Structures are given as C-alpha cells and as structure tokens.
C-alpha cells in the first residue's frame, strides 16, 4: 500500500505544471497571435550537405478566427511544384488539421495525425512544424537563463501533449527582452537530438507584430538544411473566411 501511495505521488509530481515555464510560454505565444490576418512572401532554400541548393518561392496567408488560426501556403516556383498548396488549421485545443493540394492529380489529401511528423515538401521542416504553435499543447518546464549569442535568454523544455508528435521534447530559447523564440532543439521519441531551428533578423511590423526575416532548420543526422527567408509582410488586409477551406485549395492563384 505504501509503495502504491509513493508511486501515485510521483505521478502527481510529474503532472504538476511549472508556473514559470507556462508564464514564459504564454508570453512567447502572445508575440505570434492577435494580428487578425496577414500575407507574406517566402523563399524556401533546400541545402544539401555538400552545399548544393534548390529554391522554391511561396505565398503565405493566415487568418485568425474564434481563437484559432488557419494558414495557407502556396508554391509558385519551380514549375514542378507550382500550385501545390498546404492548408493548416491550429488552435489551443484539439488536434491540428492539415490538407495538401497536389495539382498534378488535382486532389486534396488530408495529412493524418500519424503522418504529421513526416517532411514537408522534402524540407527539414515537418508538417507539424508548419502549424502555428499554441502554448496549451505542451507541458512546459523552466530550466535556466543563459546567453544565446549576444542576447540573454530563458531556456524552457516543452513536451508535446499530442501522442502522435514525432518529438519527445523540445528545448526552447526565448530572449529575455521580447520573449521571441530564437532557437529550438528537437528531440525524437528516443530522446536523441534530431534537428535545430534558429530564427534571426526579427523586425517589428506596424509597431506590434514581431516576425523573423530568416528561419533555419538543420538536420543533426544527415547535415541537410532548410532556410526560410521571409519578406513583404502585410497585416489586416481583410482576407475572407472562404479563402481558407478545402475547396479554396483547388482554386488558389
């Protein structure tokens, strides 16, 4: 009986939230949300271990509604992927949903929850990395403060609550001044470091919305990299709800 009681106490201890970790995660979340709608341009560069590159150009649109966000990514170049589009729907509760339109077969394919850990369009970003994150979908723990480059940062550990996530945990570096996510280390289900994300060149748009100019994902296993270069941010442009559903995927231009 005593052993059982101690075991239950241990489980309860692990389940307890870390107030400081949650507080910092919420502060970082506030930098991502509240923009209403937006659009931007994106250049995706795939980089091989030998330094060979392949470039893709995209348009990205997003719209917030009822506490959730939908994001539409449309490939314009190169020709073999032009017209391919990914629609992601994410929110603080429930499973994220994603649909991929493939123009070659004129078909919309839903990305199943068990497949979201797979690579997005041959990049080092997984489908689950593309969906807008919400702090409620992780268990957080504050670890320490330390330098990250020239900045002072908080370091958090977060564990995905989604049992189908490809990650067991992520280490997140937030700068202390603005609570912007500067670095993430992703660990697989076996606890091994699988890739590292860094964000640089942050700019504040309209005096409120922080966005990075560049994101870099580096695969620790094979040396491949994917660089995302962002530009042309516009906010509050009046995108319609009808632009963010499965039917809209087949008529994107």
Walk through the language-model features, giving the residues of each.
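Sec-dependent signal peptide recognition
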Residues: 1-7
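N-terminal signal peptide c-region/cleavage motif recognized by signal peptidases
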Residues: 12-14
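Boundary of Sec targeting at the N-terminus
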Residues: 16-18
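N-terminal mature ectodomain segment of secretory-pathway/periplasmic proteins
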Residues: 20-104
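Gly/Pro-enriched, hydrophobic low-complexity segments
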Residues: 26, 76, 87, 97-101, ...
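Short amphipathic beta-strand and strand-loop transition segments with alternating hydrophobic
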Residues: 59-63, 141-147, 200-203
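Internal active-site segments that recognize and position negatively charged phosphoryl groups
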Residues: 138
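Short, solvent-exposed mixed-charge patches
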Residues: 252-253
């Amino acid at each position: 009986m005593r052993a059982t009681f101690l075991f239950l106490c241990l489980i309860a201890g692990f389940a307890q939230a870390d107030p400081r970790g949650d507080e910092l995660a919420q502060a970082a979340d506030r930098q991502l949300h509240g923009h209403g709608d937006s659009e931007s341009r994106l250049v995706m560069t795939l980089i091989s271990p030998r330094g060979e590159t392949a470039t893709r150009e995209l348009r990205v649109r997003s719209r917030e509604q009822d506490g959730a966000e939908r994001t539409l990514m449309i490939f314009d170049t190169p020709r073999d992927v032009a017209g391919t589009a990914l629609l992601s729907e994410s929110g603080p509760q429930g499973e994220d949903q994603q649909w991929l339109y493939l123009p070659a077969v004129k078909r919309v394919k839903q990305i199943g929850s068990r497949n979201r850990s797979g690579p997005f369009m041959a990049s080092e970003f997984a489908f689950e990395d593309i969906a807008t994150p919400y702090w409620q979908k992780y268990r957080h723990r504050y670890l320490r403060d330390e330098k990250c480059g020239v900045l002072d940062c908080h370091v958090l550990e977060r564990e995905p609550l989604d049992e189908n996530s490809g990650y067991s945990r992520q280490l997140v570096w937030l700068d202390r001044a603005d609570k912007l996510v500067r670095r993430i280390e992703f660990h697989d289900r076996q606890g091994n470091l699988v890739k590292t994300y860094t964000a640089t060149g942050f700019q504040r748009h309209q005096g409120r919305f922080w966005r990075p100019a560049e994101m870099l994902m580096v695969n620790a296993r094979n040396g491949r990299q994917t660089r995302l270069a962002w530009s042309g941010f516009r906010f509050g442009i009046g995108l319609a709800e009808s632009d963010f559903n499965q039917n809209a995927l087949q008529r994107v231009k």
